[in-house]
Amino acid sequence: GGGTLQTPHPFTRVLWGRYWTFAHNGQLSGYDKLKTGFIRPVGQTDSELSFCWLLNRLQDRYPEPPQDMVGMFKFVAECCDELRELGVFNMLLSDGEFVMTYCTNHLYWITRRAPFGKAALLDEDVEINFQEETTTNDVVYGIATQTLTGHEKWHRIKPGGAGRCHVG
């Protein structure tokens, strides 16, 4: 959808007393048939509706917060496989402690640790000095649908692949 108050990324909702944040890249068809239960979208976008559908599926499967987060994220990946059948579905999902990604066609990740250096954006004449923006204890993750910087090792997530990391 276009850029309106109802369509901005990322989207945030509450499930199990925790905030969940979601961003999606791609286009889905037939997404209006997804059942969202009590978790309602504000707008009409495929992104927000698919997020509400994912949270509804999680709530149905896990009425209480799951103890097995690895198992929960495997279930999320299965749900993403279903959404992938509707079109391109690259996504990022986080509860502030864990970050999960799912790739339909193009998704990359990078991890940066001290000693931090500078990184130059590929599509802009901009250089970021991560040493000025971080501490020696920080670990910085980047997730994007295309590599953003040169002279760094970005890792490609294979189509149909999911990834997760613990950041909390």
Each PLM stretch: what is its role?
Residues 1-168:
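N-terminal segments that mediate ammonia production and transfer
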